Amino acid sequence: MRFGILIAFSGLMAINGNALAEGSLNVYNWSDYIAEDTIANFEAETGIKVTYDMYDSNEVLEAKMLAGSSGYDLVVPTADFLARGREAGAYQDMDLSRIPNASNQDSEIQAQADRMVGSNSAGLVYMWGSTGIAYNEDMVAERLGDDAPTDSWSLILDPANAAKLEDCGIAILDAPTDVLPNVMTYLGYPGTSMDKSHFEAAGDALSAIRPYLRYINSSQSINDIANGDICAAIMWSGDAFQAAYRAEEAENGHVIDYYIPNEGTNLWFDVMAIPADAKNVDNAYKFVDYMMRADVAAENVNYVWYASGNKAAMPDIDPEILSHQGIYPTEKAKEKLFVTPVYDAQTDRIVTRVWNRFSAGN
């Protein structure tokens, strides 16, 4: 699920829905969610010309998929959105026999995603991760002291803390299906709840801190927290670690940390899937098989700092990534992780209404 600087790949262009079916491939993925040379290497190996476009929310992707004729051959929705899209006929089944490297997949991770989607032929998990809080150690300590609750959602969701952090900048993901369930866990409700009153309570809690937020955006926080322009953010795990790495590389004095709150958080899976009306299906399979190669999967993990669905890639993944509990949680930490359910139409309307009211500041 995941963001940052837009990378200019060879072949980046507008999609017009009339791409030639031979020798081309149109991919739509989250921004900053692939190693810098992966596309160029695939093109060099296969001769297939790739058009690689990026989005910053599942809602944007879903709108294109449900409208039809998107022109894309491969997309990477989060599992719950893939489930909804499949119900609407927006995606086709994936024939795993056409993907030899599918055998590299972590069967446990894939099984969790398959249960969420409701099918074992919807697609293959690309990356998985959590939602938590990233923060600037020094800037937060200056305002909240050494006993700042850097293990809890209260760091941001408690209005008293948010007020003290307002001057250094707080940001929240523009991702209602990730944020609202976690606010519910902070309030003591199950993150898997679909009770209207629980969503309303979560919306009220967010509205209480709305005056102290710098912005609600999913693609801006990586650079801003790395540069010290904000000091705390609700972020996806890999984005937070990319920010920490960028700050370290820049030697700018900002130390960024990330944690999974002790109240619990959601576990999500991003899945490579083929739209129902894809024109370049053969090339989509070739690309998925390439992405499932152990060496390619490891290179992508080492760049984006998200956990991989590829078990065979583990030996080539940076040990720092493998050992970080914010990326690969311990078994104890996993006990507090939950998978957001696929919302029905009524619940989805509640989520949209609550989120719009909060984001508008009403």
What label would you give each PLM region?
Residues 15-21:
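Sec/Tat signal peptide C-region and signal peptidase I cleavage site
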Residues 22-85:
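Early extracytoplasmic/lumenal segment of secretory-pathway proteins
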Residues 73-76, 214, 231-236:
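Paired acidic/hydrophobic, glycine-rich loop segments that form the ligand-binding mouth/hinge
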Residues 76, 82, 86-212, 219, ...:
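Extracytoplasmic ligand-binding site segments that recognize negatively charged/polar headgroups
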Residues 81-84, 232-253:
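A ligand-binding cleft/hinge motif common to bilobed small-molecule-binding domains
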Residues 199-208, 214, 252-273:
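Periplasmic-binding protein-like
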Residues 223, 331-362:
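Conserved C-terminal helix/tail region of periplasmic/extracytoplasmic solute-binding proteins
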Residues 270, 275-336:
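Mature extracytoplasmic/periplasmic domains
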